[in-house]
Amino acid sequence: MKGTSSSNNSVVFLSSPVDSFNFRSSFIEDTPCDLYVVVAPNLIKELETYLNKGYKIDCFIPYEVKEKVVNNVTGIIKGKNPFLPPLVLTAHFDHMGKGLSGEIYRGALDNASGASFLLELSSFLASLPQPSRDIIIVSLNAEEFGLLGSKNFAKENKDLLKNATVINFDMIGSDKDIPLTFMAGEDTCFHSDLLDRLCEICNEKNITNIIENKDSSDHASFIKEGFDAITINDGDVTRIHTPEDKIEYISPTAIDRSFSVVWSEIFDSAYSSSGLFLLDSKVLILLILSALICLILKLRS
C-alpha cells in the first residue's frame, strides 16, 4: 500500500505477519521510495479504511540526512612474494545504532561478531611467520547504508587488488546447529574457485554447510568488480537489527567452526610453503600422547 511523505515522495506500507516486532532495516540510498514502513496486520487495514475515506497520511523519517566522510580501517601483513595476488579479509563494523525510544541495537551478531573475529584472526596471523602473499585486512564501514565502504574500497583499489581472493565475515557465531552459510553473489553464472575450496574443506571436516546466492553483504561489492569473494556467516536472522541482538546469543563453538574452515583456506593460500604444519586435532592429540609416553619411559629409565 502506498502513501505520501511530507516531502511529497512515495511511502510504501508493508504488512507484517506478526503484531509485535522491533526489526529495523538498513538505510539504502538508491531505493525507489523514500520510506518503507512495516506495520501490524490490523493497522494496515485501519490505514486502508482512512485512505478510502479520502484521508491523507503524512509520514516522516525522524532522522536528519547529512553528508559525511567516514573511513574504512585497513592493515596489511606483507608477504614474501609481492607478485602473488593478495588475500583480502573483511568485516563491517557499523551497526544500527539507537532506536527512537533510546533502545540500543547492540549488533552482537550483526556484526560485532564478524568485526571481532577479524581482529582476533589478524592478531593470530601477525604472530606467524611471514606468509607467501600479502594479506590485506579491512574493517569496512557503512555496510548498513548499502555496502558503501566495500563499494568504495573495491572500486578504488581494483588495480592494487588484481586477482585477489576476498573472504568476508558477517554474522559469525550464532548457533553450531545452524549450517555454516557461504554467501555467493546473485549472479549464479559467476564461478567461484574459493567457494569450491571452502565446500571441500567442510566436507573433509564433516561440517554441514549451505550456499546462498545473495548480494546482501560486502562480498557483493568485490564480485561486481571482478573478484572472487565469499561471505561466511551462520545464516541466523532471528534477532539481527533488533535490540535482542545481544552477546548472550553468541556461540563460541560456532565461532570455532568458522575459524577451522577459514584457517584451512588461509593456510593453503598463504602459509603452506612457509614451513608451518597444519595439524588435525586428532593428530595433535596423538603427538602429545606419544611425547608424554616417551617422557614417562625416559624418566623410568
Can you say where each PLM-predicted feature lies in the sequence?
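Soluble metallo-hydrolase cores and metallopeptidase-like ectodomains found primarily
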Residues: R24-R106, S127, S132
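Extracellular/luminal Protease-associated
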Residues: M1-Y36, K205-T208
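Alpha-helical transmembrane segments
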Residues: L286-S301
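Acidic/histidine-rich catalytic neighborhood of metal-dependent amide-processing enzymes
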Residues: V69-N72, P82, G97-C189
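Solvent-exposed loop/turn segments at secondary-structure junctions
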Residues: P17-F21, K66, N81-P82, F93-G97, ...
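Second-shell loop/turn segments in exported
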Residues: M1, T31-V38, I61-Y63, S101-N111, ...
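Structural recognition of the beta-strand scaffold that forms the well-ordered cores
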Residues: S10-L14, T74, L87-T90, I136-S139, ...
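Active-site-adjacent substrate-binding region
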Residues: I172-L286
